[in-house]
């Protein structure tokens, strides 16, 4: 396998080969993203199926087939939106418990708990006889999302060698996109199965749920997690195993030092608010808010519903959603290749321009061609809308999609990493919930201007990246403070060298263990 060295801030070289166990562990752990993506993708297709609406939302079905209802308002129903968004509200709540389990029980066991929640939730959804069972199933799936999204990005960032950390971490987002595509393909097939096709759509979530559960049973926990829980020898043995070398002392000592400082922190959530941790916290929180206000989840949740609204028939709308799902997967592969080469900032800035232009174009086309009563786009215009949606999705998929998870998971010091990831997931799910719950109502009231609304947010977030987001590629995870935050023109003012938690002297010199 390929070998190499990761250079630490103190000049110490961390020897690390790209070993099969690292690749396999990362692939298995990243199936948590597969489950998340399937849950995101499946709800939009299911809620556009007449059989599903007849069973649970007959009033929406009636509105859908009545000409008197505005095209933009056919699906404006709080109960229907709650079906989609309840998952994210449950995930938000579960995140607080997941922070405790990742710290006390480890990353691996937390992923196993997520898998169990997913399996039980799938059973409830597939067998749902009424709306209550349906919502309970979504809530259980949401708990799984909370635990998985807490543990998986941390696991990937900690187990990966520094020089390919970005690419391996993006496996999580790649699996999210594959899950969405899988869901779109399933919906395209099950829409033709009457009257129980929707049950099959919801039940097939059991496949990614089983993969995550089995994966969590067989992967090793991260050295950082084992050492943090006092299992030093086991942590060193795992470090040797995953790095493919016996020469792990420098990296081991750095993790031990970071862990020692982490043990002194009794209240990690309170510690997040301390001045020296504010840059990481602000970046993590804003990245999650900005990620949702690109409008991506609004489009991915409701792609079939959205295309239906624009005048596509059910088959055509699901087919168009499959196309956008495929573009999502392929574009995320671009990020896997380029994130450790061109860096995080460049991908985000390029995507900002592309997302802005495509959303403005969609708003203009819809403003001209789709009115409250007329949705006859015409073949050429319809193709243009799909192309513009794909252009938008592709730019998101190689930027804000994966990097919204990668950057927070690699910037927090060990002492606040679990708490920081918890806040990251919590904010992400909170704003995902807000968008999921509000989108169909916003579409009803703003109409085509909803895309102009999201494009304005893209301008704001791109300016933030330009001025305030530091580059983190090829920086060892335990050395972000010294080599990133203390060097940044704005954030360095929050870094206090006198703070004993920053750099612990070792024979009069920094050993590079920053926290």
Swiss-Prot record:
GO terms for cellular component: membrane. Pfam families: Sugar_tr. The keyword Nucleotide-binding does not apply. Residues 39-78, 130-138, 187-199, 302-315, 369-379, 444-448 are extracellular. One of its GO terms (molecular function) is monosaccharide transmembrane transporter activity. The chain crosses the membrane at residues 18-38, 79-99, 109-129, 139-159, 166-186, 200-220, 281-301, 316-336, 348-368, 380-400, 423-443, 449-469. InterPro entries: MFS_dom, MFS_STP/MST-like_plant, MFS_sugar_transport-like, MFS_trans_sf, STP/PLT_plant, Sugar/inositol_transpt, Sugar_transporter_CS. It is a multi-pass membrane protein. Its main location: membrane. Residues 1-17, 100-108, 160-165, 221-280, 337-347, 401-422, 470-515 are cytoplasmic. Expressed in roots, shoots, leaf blades, leaf sheaths, anthers, ovaries and embryos. Keywords: Membrane, Sugar transport, Symport, Transmembrane, Transmembrane helix, Transport. This is Sugar transport protein MST4.
